[in-house]
């Protein structure tokens, strides 16, 4: 009986630890970052226009597309920053005062894609994530929200946005990452933060 309980405990602990092992498999950022860096002049221009760190833009390009402007995902996310026309693309169009959504050819255009990606990061920062005080925590919140939606992130803290932001402001960057790893419904959420750090270190 004791042996059976011990075996169960080992399995339970293994399950808990594997849930948070978002660094496996390891991700080598060197080549994706090198390819993403070729777009740095555009990233700097878009970053200046929208108040977004061009290194953050470059890291997202490395993670999302590996620097390939023609990349198209199974979910129809398109281009360097893997934007979806019907969601993030439509949000950017609305911010610009335009109707409709971007075309596939527009999203495959490096300058337009990076500009819209930077605009979307600005929408997240000044909208649902407004009020986050720690710059590193904000950076982590931005990439998790960029990949999986701001609502999914905030709901792991509270259904009330203001309360969620207040709880986020009680955490430092490491505590925020741990919270995401333990509570976010998308397994790729903490892994995105891991990849972000790998990409920034490779620049």
UniProtKB/Swiss-Prot annotation:
What's the EC number here? 4.2.2.n2
- What is the residue range of the signal peptide feature? 1-15
Instruction: Give the originating organism.
Output: Escherichia coli (strain 55989 / EAEC)
Q: What is this protein called?
A: Endo-type membrane-bound lytic murein transglycosylase A
> A Gene Ontology CC term for this entry?
cell outer membrane
Keywords linked to the UniProt accession: Cell outer membrane, Cell wall biogenesis/degradation, Lipoprotein, Lyase, Membrane, Palmitate, Signal
Q: Give the protein family.
A: Belongs to the transglycosylase Slt family.
Q: Which CDD domains match?
A: LT_MltC_MltE
Q: How does it sit in the membrane?
A: Lipid-anchor
InterPro entries attached to this UniProt entry? EmtA, Lysozyme-like_dom_sf, Transglyc_AS, Transglycosylase_SLT_dom_1
Broadest EC class assigned to this enzyme: lyase
Lipid sites, type N-palmitoyl cysteine? 16
Q: Tell me the GO BP annotations in alphabetical order.
A: cell wall macromolecule catabolic process; cell wall organization; peptidoglycan metabolic process
Say yes or no: keyword Cell wall biogenesis/degradation present.
Answer: yes
Q: Where is the lipid attached (S-diacylglycerol cysteine)?
A: 16
Is Cell wall biogenesis/degradation there in the keyword field? yes
Q: Which GO molecular function entries does the Swiss-Prot or TrEMBL record give?
A: lytic endotransglycosylase activity
Compartment(s) of residence: Cell outer membrane
Q: Which Pfam families match?
A: SLT
Q: Which reaction(s) are listed as its catalytic activity?
A: Endolytic cleavage of the (1->4)-beta-glycosidic linkage between N-acetylmuramic acid (MurNAc) and N-acetylglucosamine (GlcNAc) residues in peptidoglycan with concomitant formation of a 1,6-anhydrobond in the MurNAc residue
Function summary: Murein-degrading enzyme. May play a role in recycling of muropeptides during cell elongation and/or cell division. Preferentially cleaves at a distance of more than two disaccharide units from the ends of the glycan chain.
């Amino acid at each position: 009986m004791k042996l059976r309980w011990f075996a169960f405990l080992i399995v339970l602990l293994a399950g808990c630890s594997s849930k948070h092992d978002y660094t496996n498999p390891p991700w080598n950022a060197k080549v994706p970052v090198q390819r993403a860096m070729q777009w740095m002049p555009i990233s700097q221009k878009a970053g200046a226009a929208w108040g977004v760190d061009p290194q953050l833009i470059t890291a997202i390009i490395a993670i999302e597309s590996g620097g390939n402007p023609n990349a198209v995902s199974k979910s129809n996310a398109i281009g360097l920053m893997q934007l979806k026309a019907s969601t993030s693309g439509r949000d950017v169009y609305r911010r610009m005062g335009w109707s409709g959504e971007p075309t596939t050819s527009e999203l495959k255009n490096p300058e337009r894609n990076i500009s819209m990606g930077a605009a979307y990061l600005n929408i997240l920062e000044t909208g649902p994530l407004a009020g986050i005080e720690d710059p590193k925590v904000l950076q982590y919140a931005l990439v998790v929200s960029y990949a999986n939606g701001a609502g999914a992130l905030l709901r792991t803290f509270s259904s009330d946005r203001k309360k969620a932001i207040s709880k986020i402001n009680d955490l430092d960057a490491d505590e925020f990452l741990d919270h995401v790893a333990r509570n976010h419904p998308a397994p790729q959420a903490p892994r995105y933060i891991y990849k972000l750090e790998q990409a920034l270190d490779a620049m």
